[in-house]
Amino acid sequence: AIDCKTVDAALVPCVPYLTGGGTPTTQCCSGVSSIKTMAGTPQDKKDACNCVKAAANRYPNIRDDVAQALPVKCNVQLDIPVSRTTNCDAI
């Protein structure tokens, strides 16, 4: 099962990148990679998606364009969008 606290902890190092752009830190990309590892099953993906969405909604100044580029910048094939508006049931 996915624990949102774990997802939150993984994303915290990404907040400066998500709000300002530039290049994500190694710690941020490690967190993105760990979320991918956690989300092994379709249900886990949905749960992780909801955690990511909830985390994104706690930071109103996250830039959506930057957030969507995060997996690419980290070179992680993440099937979960980093967005405040994702329909997690559609994943």
From Swiss-Prot:
Example GO biological process: lipid transport
Record keywords: Disulfide bond, Lipid-binding, Transport
Gene Ontology molecular function terms on file: lipid binding
Superkingdom of origin organism: Eukaryota
SMART domains, A to Z: AAI
Membership in a protein family: Belongs to the plant LTP family.
Function field: Plant non-specific lipid-transfer proteins transfer phospholipids as well as galactolipids across membranes. May play a role in wax or cutin deposition in the cell walls of expanding epidermal cells and certain secretory tissues. Binds to both saturated and unsaturated lipids, with the highest binding efficiency for linoleic acid, followed by linolenic acid.
This protein's name: Non-specific lipid-transfer protein 1
Species this chain originates from: Foeniculum vulgare (Fennel)
Classification of source organism: Eukaryota, Viridiplantae, Streptophyta, Embryophyta, Tracheophyta
